[in-house]
């Protein structure tokens, strides 16, 4: 049994979740392909302060209404049979109830959900003895792979195209992620003392 660390937004939720909200709020017509940087202030031509004001007003409804990524549910249902599913997200802690309600509404299994309130997930990864992490944020993937010394499956997106470490595996969807995991399971099995 492996302890799988899994990000939420852009990993089990659709990567274009924010697009309709951004388009409506900022009177734009962007698509996911226009989001070539995780920092949306550049695309929106606004300051960090303006962005976080917008997030404070909108993130609860965005997370509440987020759609699942393609094949995420069936893949997670398969993985839960053999592994612990530990979700580690950058969401802030005031979103705890909305997060749990979303998981229940989507009927997504979890063994634990941790909202770390920022993009530094390494401490939580180490605390939970994660064997493999699933992520969409390039910076998080690099940090986890290097500092926690574990493989990271990085879900390909227009905003994470920077070069990657040898401990990071790019996939296009959940089917590819599960296939890679099944093909490499023997390398990942935790040695129990």
Curated annotation (Swiss-Prot):
Annotated GO MF terms: hydrolase activity
Keywords from the UniProt entry: Hydrolase
Enzyme Commission number(s) from the entry: 3.1.3.-
UniProt-listed InterPro entries: 5_3-deoxyribonucleotidase-like (IPR052419), HAD-like_sf (IPR036412), HAD_sf (IPR023214), Nucleotidase_putative (IPR009206)
Top-tier EC class: hydrolase
Keyword field contains Iron-sulfur: no
PANTHER family, per database record: NUCLEOTIDASE YQFW-RELATED
Annotated family: Belongs to the 5'(3')-deoxyribonucleotidase family.
Stated name of the protein: Putative nucleotidase YqfW
Native source organism of the sequence: Bacillus subtilis (strain 168)
């Amino acid at each position: 049994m492996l302890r799988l660390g899994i990000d939420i937004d852009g990993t089990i939720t659709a990567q274009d979740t924010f697009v309709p909200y951004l388009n409506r709020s900022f009177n734009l017509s962007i698509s996911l392909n226009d989001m070539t940087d995780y920092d949306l202030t550049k695309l929106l031509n606004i300051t960090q302060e303006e962005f976080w004001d917008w997030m404070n007003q909108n993130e609860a409804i965005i997370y509440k209404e987020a759609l699942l990524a393609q094949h995420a549910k069936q893949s997670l249902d398969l993985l839960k049979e053999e592994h612990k599913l530990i979700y580690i997200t950058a969401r802030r802690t005031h979103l705890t109830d909305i997060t749990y309600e979303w998981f229940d509404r989507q009927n997504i299994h979890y063994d634990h959900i941790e909202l770390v309130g920022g993009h530094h997930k390494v401490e939580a990864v180490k605390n939970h003895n994660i064997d493999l992490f699933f992520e969409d944020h390039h910076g998080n993937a690099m940090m986890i792979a290097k500092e926690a010394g574990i493989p990271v499956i990085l879900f390909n997106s227009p905003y994470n195209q920077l070069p990657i470490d040898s401990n990071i595996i790019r996939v296009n969807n959940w089917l590819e992620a599960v296939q890679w995991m099944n093909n490499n399971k023997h390398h990942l099995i935790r040695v129990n003392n």
